[in-house]
Amino acid sequence: MGVVSFAQESESPVAPGRLFKALILDSHNLCPKLMPQSIKSIDIIQGDGGVGTIKQTNFTRGIHIKHRIDEVDNEKCRCKFTLIEGDVMGEKLRSAGYEIEFMDDGEGGSICRMLSEYETVGDVVFRDEDIEEGKEKATELFKPVEAFLLANPDAYA
């Protein structure tokens, strides 16, 4: 068993509050509309969107993941959540935690910082390729939302 952590940062011309609202607070409504080829639905299984809420993302390829929201700070545009079911949970991972923060870049846009921490099962080792694949999945979600917000400047304002 080991713990693997990595940080990822990306810049966006979209303001932090808009990205936070779209990607964190309203992802269950927006993401399936923007990415119907990969996301079938995102259902709120428990809660009201705040701390303790459990969301299930159903992918078009027939698998799902569930995550629990552990912390939400609307003022700081920050969220912490834990993957609790699906994907490689149990098989390769004992736990997976994430912290996402959208910060003002001083020019009207934002810097998105994501910290990921994985606790592996047994002697499973995360390879660099696994980490890169995780970063690519995050980008696949981020870019369509960013494009939508740029094309719709009043959305999530």
In which residue ranges do the predicted regions lie?
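A short, structured loop/turn motif at beta-sheet edges
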Residues: P16-G17, G47, D70-R78, E101-I111
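Beta-strand/loop substructures that line and gate deep hydrophobic ligand-binding cavities in soluble
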Residues: K80-E140
